[in-house]
């Protein structure tokens, strides 16, 4: 790899990071607008036209707030915790493909030594396995935040969140095993390519896996109706009760990054990813562009689903949450692996 290739990869990574941060910023605005609509009010509309500068105002607010440390906290761990959550969220995003390969012009091929531009930072053979491994490490950021804050509400929220994430990683992972069996690969690009003729959602094991995945996805991202770790009526705001200013912003952004990443993953696993439906424009030079448009449309639907569910459904009790994961989802996930194994034989 020469210096031009390294520089090109760094520029692409920086562009992806900028897109993700911008998407997260406006996702927060979208959530407040949707909440306002559901609650029959306007939502934020003072910063810029129709409130479009509200994310910028929020960012300035977080950056300029005074940094306050509670008494008797472990400062090193207290500061490391939000950094762990943010780092895991960014690294998980790195293996998500946004589209197919785009042919590069000849002059750029000479400069970079690359024939195509991959709309993905990295494409390891372990793909989906890498994504879930990195996502599971975010648990450490949460439990460290709860312990280092020297606050009972924070610690209880961290313990709840850790138990919840560990419990729902099992059905989440096992639902993906069914899709890996159907597609024969761990790479997200290969899984998307295997759905050219028929999306996985229209296959029996794929449909069952989708139902399991969506429920576990809400639990893994700590969103309603599974936000027991941040239950305002019980725990103030849970594990980040003692966090403010930019430190809180890191937790906040990481949560929205995880929601966007999960929306991308569910699209890639079950809804054909960036494949254009019915084989339209197959082999056409504009296929990657239209594929990106279709992919973003599907992702927007699932990001909206996160918001709609949050503001319309009540919260589970903690015992109901754990019972659903261990007694309902896991047995169904195991059964679905068997169904997928039988399905590919016929």
Swiss-Prot record:
Keywords: Cell inner membrane, Cell membrane, Membrane, NAD, Quinone, Translocase, Transmembrane, Transmembrane helix, Ubiquinone. Pfam families: NADHdh. The keyword 4Fe-4S does not apply. The chain crosses the membrane at residues 6-26, 76-96, 128-148, 166-186, 198-218, 260-280, 289-309, 324-344. It comes from Leptospira interrogans serogroup Icterohaemorrhagiae serovar copenhageni (strain Fiocruz L1-130). This is NADH-quinone oxidoreductase subunit H. It is a multi-pass membrane protein. The keyword Transmembrane helix applies. NCBIfam families: PRK06076.1-2. InterPro entries: NADH_UbQ_OxRdtase_su1/FPO, NADH_UbQ_OxRdtase_su1_CS. The gene is nuoH. It catalyses: a quinone + NADH + 5 H(+)(in) = a quinol + NAD(+) + 4 H(+)(out). Its EC number is 7.1.1.-. Belongs to the complex I subunit 1 family. It comes from the Bacteria. PANTHER family: NADH DEHYDROGENASE SUBUNIT 1, NADH-UBIQUINONE OXIDOREDUCTASE CHAIN 1. NDH-1 shuttles electrons from NADH, via FMN and iron-sulfur (Fe-S) centers, to quinones in the respiratory chain. The immediate electron acceptor for the enzyme in this species is believed to be ubiquinone. Couples the redox reaction to proton translocation (for every two electrons transferred, four hydrogen ions are translocated across the cytoplasmic membrane), and thus conserves the redox energy in a proton gradient. This subunit may bind ubiquinone.
């Amino acid at each position: 790899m020469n210096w031009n290739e390294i520089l090109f990869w760094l520029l692409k990574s920086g562009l992806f990071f900028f897109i993700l941060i911008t998407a997260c910023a406006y996702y927060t605005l979208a959530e407040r607008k949707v909440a306002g609509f559901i609650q029959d009010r306007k939502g934020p509309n003072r910063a810029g036209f129709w409130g479009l500068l509200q994310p910028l105002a929020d960012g300035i607010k977080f950056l300029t707030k005074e940094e306050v440390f509670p008494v008797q906290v472990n400062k090193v761990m207290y500061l490391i915790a939000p950094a762990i959550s943010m780092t895991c969220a960014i690294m998980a995003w790195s293996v998500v493909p946004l589209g197919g390969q785009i042919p590069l012009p000849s002059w750029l091929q000479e400069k970079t030594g690359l024939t195509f531009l991959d709309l993905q930072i990295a494409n390891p053979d372990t793909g989906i396995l890498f994504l879930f491994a990195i996502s599971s490490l975010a648990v450490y950021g949460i439990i460290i935040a709860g312990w280092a804050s020297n606050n009972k509400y924070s610690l209880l929220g961290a313990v709840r969140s850790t138990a919840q994430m560990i419990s729902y990683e099992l059905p989440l992972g096992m639902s993906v095993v069914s899709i890996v069996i159907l597609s024969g690969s761990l790479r997200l690009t290969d899984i998307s390519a295997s759905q050219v003729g028929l999306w996985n959602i229209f296959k029996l094991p794929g449909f069952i896996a989708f139902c399991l995945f969506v429920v576990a996805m809400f639990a893994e991202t700590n969103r309603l109706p599974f936000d027991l770790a941040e239950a305002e009526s019980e725990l103030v705001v849970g594990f980040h009760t003692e966090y403010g200013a930019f430190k809180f912003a890191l937790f906040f952004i990481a949560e929205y990054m995880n929601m966007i990443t999960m929306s991308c993953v569910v699209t890639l696993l079950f809804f054909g990813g960036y494949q254009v439906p019915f084989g339209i424009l197959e082999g056409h030079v504009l296929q990657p562009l239209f594929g990106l448009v279709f992919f973003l449309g599907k992702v927007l639907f699932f990001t909206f689903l996160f918001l709609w569910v949050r503001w319309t459904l009540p919260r589970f009790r903690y015992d109901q949450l754990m019972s659903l994961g261990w007694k309902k989802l896991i047995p169904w996930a195991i059964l679905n692996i068997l169904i997928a194994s039988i399905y590919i034989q016929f």
